[in-house]
């Protein structure tokens, strides 16, 4: 039986029809929003999602390197290296990237949320944010297991450094916060420094920005 979520993503994506001087032109809803410089990061962070996100970031930079990009995040997290590919691209490109959590930003999702441009990191009131240390498993020879364990420790240290950079918290505070699954409300994430504001509606004087 086909996964209902997979069915939704593949068959029920709305289309938008616009009138142009050359007649009608149709877009799927996500492509239309991409024209407005809006990127969606939804679902698990893995190589396929990461590749699409990086490609969209690079495309929007090429389109206009001075205009901000809005990234909407609703993700349970996923593969660390896939998330770091998105993170590095966000830091690499010229446009400022605004982030907004809708639903949840857990694990790597929370890191991408806090990686947005300073003063441009937001969450909706009922969003949930979760931070924790990386996890992994490996089978094989003892030496290989030890090497993989060391790599996980290296990744843990690097992720902690990223959280320190973007939250302004000390390394000790970050290590304590990430020791176990740490679930936060939007307000708690604001107090911790993961985001800059909790918003419940668009500013009345600017409806053009996505966040």
UniProtKB/Swiss-Prot annotation:
GO terms for molecular function: ATP-dependent peptidase activity; ATPase binding; serine-type endopeptidase activity. Pfam families: CLP_protease. One of its GO terms (biological process) is protein quality control for misfolded or incompletely synthesized proteins. It is found in: Cytoplasm. It is an enzyme of class 3 (hydrolase). It catalyses: Hydrolysis of proteins to small peptides in the presence of ATP and magnesium. alpha-casein is the usual test substrate. In the absence of ATP, only oligopeptides shorter than five residues are hydrolyzed (such as succinyl-Leu-Tyr-|-NHMec, and Leu-Tyr-Leu-|-Tyr-Trp, in which cleavage of the -Tyr-|-Leu- and -Tyr-|-Trp bonds also occurs). Keywords: Cytoplasm, Hydrolase, Protease, Serine protease. Its main location: cytoplasm. The active site is at residues 107, 132. One of its GO terms (cellular component) is endopeptidase Clp complex. PANTHER family: ATP-DEPENDENT CLP PROTEASE PROTEOLYTIC SUBUNIT (PTHR10381:SF70). HAMAP family: ClpP. Fourteen ClpP subunits assemble into 2 heptameric rings which stack back to back to give a disk-like structure with a central cavity, resembling the structure of eukaryotic proteasomes. Cleaves peptides in various proteins in a process that requires ATP hydrolysis. Has a chymotrypsin-like activity. Plays a major role in the degradation of misfolded proteins. This is ATP-dependent Clp protease proteolytic subunit. It comes from Xanthobacter autotrophicus (strain ATCC BAA-1158 / Py2).
